[in-house]
């Protein structure tokens, strides 16, 4: 018995017919050649079937890269933001521009190396090159799995300098953060609420911009913000789901949001007017305003780096730091249990309160 490894009726029917045809060809081959191959009884039946299957593969059985992209987006793209489809499609376009749209078994290591060299020549940073290779490898591997192909991925294991062009983000000094928070309180509008909210929680911008008002819990013994997945805003990793106690400027911002007269269910309605949270729009607007107050090279994301430094400076244990920031620690033990309670997290956050 062989599993067709798909829930899609169309693909199941196609693969069932294909498997049936391959078996029929195999038995026909045995009937015709058995008398001519004295050592056949000693051969591995598994190897024979595999070899016969590969010999009988036709172009019709193997998808091209465009078809591989389509099935990848159809199944893996469900519930993902538009940026996911856009990034995968962009990478596909790059590969086609360099090597053309071919059947998967026709792509070579040479194609992969030319793709790498083209990305580098284009001026992409090491992290961007890594991201493009991640997408093309995922598209290729998913199609190989779905179509049960015996193919190696020519885009796997290609070397490139991951540090090329990467600018290390500098943390923002604590005194500058305090000045920034005071300016936010002075202006007191929704853009400044978002900056203040991020400043004392270490949240990612997309996490903050996609919040519901109901994610801000102010009536508990310890006020906190709940970071959870929403249809309009995904989370980066499983570790990103967490509760962060609210202190200082972040608590102030949460109170302003809850007490605002806006009837929207979103904490930041202006960035949630479409199907997905417009984190890029928020980034552009907030970084432009912050530029006058922070050192050169610092951005809104620097607040996240700063929170890690602030916690480190008070000798906060690394696993607590990781839980507050939603960082993946890489240690096995952190995947067990429910993590630290709000009282423990709050104790350490209170130590870095700038007020």
How should each PLM-predicted stretch be described?
Residues 3-82, 93:
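N-terminal helical hairpins
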Residues 94, 102-110, 121-156, 204-206:
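N-terminal DNA-binding recognition helix of tyrosine site-specific recombinases/integrases
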Residues 126, 130, 156-211, 240, ...:
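Basic, Lys/Arg- and aromatic-enriched nucleic-acid-binding interface segment
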Residues 141-151, 198-222, 318-320:
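Short, charged phosphate-coordinating catalytic segments
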Residues 210-253:
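Conserved tyrosine-mediated DNA breakage-rejoining catalytic core shared by Y-recombinases
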Residues 216-222, 296-297, 316-337:
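Short, polar N-cap/turn motifs at the start of nucleic acid-interacting alpha helices
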Residues 231, 251, 274, 325-355:
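Catalytic-site neighborhood detector that most strongly recognizes the C-terminal catalytic loop/helix
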Residues 247-296:
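Active-site/catalytic core of tyrosine-dependent DNA strand-transfer enzymes
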């Amino acid at each position: 018995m062989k599993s067709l490894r798909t829930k899609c009726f169309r693909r199941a029917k196609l693969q069932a017919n294909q498997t049936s045809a391959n078996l029929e060809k195999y038995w026909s081959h045995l009937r015709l050649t058995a008398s001519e191959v004295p050592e056949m009884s000693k051969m591995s039946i598994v190897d024979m079937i595999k070899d016969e299957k590969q010999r009988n593969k036709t172009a019709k059985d193997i998808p091209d890269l465009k078809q591989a992209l389509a099935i990848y987006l159809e199944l893996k793209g469900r519930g993902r933001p538009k940026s996911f489809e856009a990034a995968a499609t962009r990478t596909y376009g790059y590969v086609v521009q360099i090597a053309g749209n071919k059947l998967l078994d026709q792509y070579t290591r040479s194609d992969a190396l030319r793709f790498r060299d083209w990305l580098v020549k284009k001026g992409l940073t090491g992290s961007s090159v890594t991201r493009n290779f991640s997408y093309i490898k995922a598209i290729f591997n998913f199609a190989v799995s779905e179509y049960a192909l015996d193919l190696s991925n020519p885009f796997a294991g290609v070397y490139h300098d991951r540090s090329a062009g990467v600018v290390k983000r500098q943390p923002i000094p604590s005194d500058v953060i305090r000045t920034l928070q005071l300016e936010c309180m002075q202006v007191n509008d929704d853009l400044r609420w978002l900056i203040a909210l991020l400043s004392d929680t270490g949240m990612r911008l997309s996490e903050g911009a996609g919040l519901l008002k109901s994610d801000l819990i102010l009536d508990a013994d310890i006020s906190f913000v709940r970071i959870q997945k929403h249809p309009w805003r995904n989370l980066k990793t499983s570790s990103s789901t967490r509760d962060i106690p609210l202190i200082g400027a972040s608590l102030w911002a949460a109170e302003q949001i809850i007490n605002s007269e806006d009837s929207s269910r979103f904490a930041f309605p202006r960035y949630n007017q479409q199907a997905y949270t417009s984190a890029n729009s928020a980034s552009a607007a907030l970084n432009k305003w912050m530029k006058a107050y922070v050192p050169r090279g610092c951005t809104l994301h620097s607040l996240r780096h700063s929170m890690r430094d602030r916690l480190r400076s008070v000798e906060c244990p690394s696993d607590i730091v990781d839980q507050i920031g939603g960082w993946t620690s890489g240690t096995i033990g952190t995947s067990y249990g429910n993590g630290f309670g709000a009282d423990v997290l709050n104790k350490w956050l209170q130590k870095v309160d700038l007020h």
